């Protein structure tokens, strides 16, 4: 998933809290930013099988 909101890549070492931005550079430390959205798939997802089953049934 791609998000327009980005977070400072170095926030854990540079800032005391996450710093969010819309651009490619952090507004406070001028460091790079990265996508803040979580990964859309996790192998440990306990309910993923059920969601996929519902989607398959809905598309049939």
Curated annotation (Swiss-Prot):
One of its GO terms (biological process) is rRNA processing. NCBIfam families: PRK13130.1 (NF009623). InterPro entries: H/ACA_rnp_Nop10 (IPR007264), H/ACA_rnp_Nop10_sf (IPR036756), Nop10_arc-typ (IPR023532). Involved in ribosome biogenesis; more specifically in 18S rRNA pseudouridylation and in cleavage of pre-rRNA. This is Ribosome biogenesis protein Nop10. The gene is nop10. GO terms for molecular function: snoRNA binding. SUPFAM superfamilies: Nop10-like SnoRNP. Gene3D superfamilies: H/ACA ribonucleoprotein complex, subunit Nop10. The keyword Ribonucleoprotein applies. GO terms for cellular component: ribonucleoprotein complex. It comes from Halorubrum lacusprofundi (strain ATCC 49239 / DSM 5036 / JCM 8891 / ACAM 34). Belongs to the NOP10 family. Keywords: Ribonucleoprotein, Ribosome biogenesis, rRNA processing. It comes from the Archaea. Residues 29-60 are annotated as: Disordered.
